[in-house]
Structure formats: C-alpha cells, structure tokens
Regions:
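Alpha-helical propensity feature that highlights long, continuous alpha-helices across diverse contexts
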Residues: 1-182
Length: 182
C-alpha cells in the first residue's frame, strides 16, 4: 500500500493524541464524509495531513507503514480482505465492520495491535524505561498488554483507534473491505 494511507495513519495519531490544537476523535470519519464533494474541510484536512507527514522523521514514517502492513492480518481475522475500489472514495459499510465487532473480538484485535507495536519498537532498538527518550530509544509503554491494561488503561484507546479507523484509512486511500468466502 502507498504512503497516502500511512499519511492518514499519522494524521489520526496527531489529531487524537499528539497535537492538542487538532484534538478531534473522529477526524478520519469526518474527512471520509467530506471527501466525495471535495469540500473545503476535506482539502484543509488533506493538506494538514500532508504537512504533518512531511515533518515526520523517516523512522516514524516507517512505524506508520508497519501499522498498515498489519491491516490485512486484522481484516483476515474478521473474515475480510482488502482490495482496490472502483469508487472514489470507497464505500464503507460501518455495520459490516465496526458495528458488528463483539467486545471479545475487539479485545483480541487491540491486543494484537499492542503486541505489533511492541515488536516494531523493539526491532527498531527501543527499550522499556520509566521515561520516554527519543534519543536513547526508550519508552515506558513497551510492556505486555495485560500490564498496560492495569497500569495505563487510557493508553489502550490508541490501539482501539487503530481498529476503529481502519476502514476509513483504507477508503481514503482508495481501498475497500470485502467479505472473504467461508
């Protein structure tokens, strides 16, 4: 998949967690809804996403690309495949994806994302430490999922956002979900 999708992954993170001035939880849903008519909102958000992507260091760009790489695994777990869409933007049926996620399945996917993130950071040379340090590659959240749930339950929301926003990121990049044959 292309960097356009990784750009939206980064934009979601910046809008939800990194930049307080951008703070808006459903930014990708809003962007998707304004996409079809190329409204001023969509154009502004797209430029903002591109600007934030251009400022991002290459290792963090790769972190976004790696997250995208896991999408096919998440989708297969739910019985979906990913394909190029004939429509622009691709149609999203929320009832097909997010609305039907049982709590146990969401928990499984969130846990998978957490372990994917831990592995990505560890392979890149990061180590667990009490304080985050980008120079020495240290991060306090490199820990097992069950420990994260106990010590930092608010952080689990980031992993859940990866799952909830997956269809929007794919649609904005011109991809769609389809039900795999049983």
């Amino acid at each position: 998949m292309q960097d356009k999708l990784a750009l939206y992954v980064n934009y979601l993170y910046d809008c939800c967690y990194a930049d307080e001035s951008l703070k808006q939880k459903e930014v990708l849903k809003k962007m998707y809804e304004s996409y079809g008519n190329h409204s001023a909102d969509f154009i502004l958000m797209n430029h903002q996403a591109q600007y934030l992507w251009n400022k991002l260091s290459e290792p963090l760009r790769w972190a976004n690309r790696y997250q995208l790489d896991a999408y096919s695994v998440f989708c297969r777990t739910l019985g979906y495949g990913i394909r190029r869409s004939d429509h622009s933007p691709a149609h999203i049926s929320e009832s097909m994806f997010n609305e039907d996620l049982p709590a146990q399945v969401l928990y499984l996917l969130v846990r998978m994302e957490k372990y994917r993130w831990n592995a990505e950071r560890t392979v890149a040379g990061w180590k667990r430490a009490k304080v985050k340090d980008k120079v020495f590659l240290q991060h306090p959240l490199i820990m097992p999922f069950c420990e994260l749930l106990q010590k930092h339950p608010e952080e689990v929301e980031k992993d859940a956002d990866v799952i909830y926003n997956l269809p929007y990121i794919l649609a904005l990049g011109g991809y769609e979900l389809y039900r795999l044959a049983d």
